[in-house]
Amino acid sequence: MTERELLTAGLRELGVAECPSAADNLLRYSEILREKNKVMNLTAITDPTEIVTRHFLDCAALAPYMPQDGRVLDVGTGAGFPGMPLAILCPQTEFVLLDALRKRIDFLNEVIADLGLTNVTAVHARAEDYARDNRDTFDLAVSRAVADLRVLSELALPMIKVGGAFLAMKAEDCTEEVETAANARMILGAPDAEVLHYTVPFDEVSRA
């Protein structure tokens, strides 16, 4: 299968509606990522097929949970995961990609400009600093492979509106981490965490 065929089939398996330009934009994003990765440490995954499965389709698993016409914060976005693929797949949702490293934000701004995306903004800031002026601002927060869930909860939850949610992408066996974060959730007034398991199409690894 080509990367395009793999992407289209994987999105279909995940039940993600693909807007007309999504595949083109994701594959272009992959090109820019691989090119910039030659001079910047953006990702350890450089094979085009693995970028589709282990980055794009993994992130796309969250697409059904994105609030239409809502605001989503990606905490510690790195090279744009999961926020950038989600912004491409969910054009009616507004995304803010937050990272403390300026070179990553410069890269993301280049991707945004190249793809002509209008629903995503890359912000250079530490989460604890950004939170001071953005409490109760977002309908949803997401993160992927950033930090311990207890720390993430303390950073992200204050920026989420009442009734919103925080989706933290973790390894399949994250029970201990979820339990350790329980006190932070309680102090911040968040409900008990729910662990959802899923398998990425064309990838043998299960995630949570």
Where are the regions that the model predicts?
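Class I SAM-dependent transferase core
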Residues: 2-73, 103-106, 110-120
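Residue-level signal for inorganic ion chemistry
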Residues: 33, 86, 170
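Helix-to-beta-strand junctions that scaffold the AdoMet/dcAdoMet cofactor pocket
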Residues: 90, 160-162
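Active-site capping/gating segments
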Residues: 173-208
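Conserved beta-strand signature within the Rossmann-like core of class I S-adenosyl-L-methionine
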Residues: 163-173
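Conserved SAM/SAH cofactor-binding pocket of Class I
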Residues: 57-146, 153-154
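Short loop/edge segments at beta-strand edges and connector loops
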Residues: 46, 123-126, 196-197
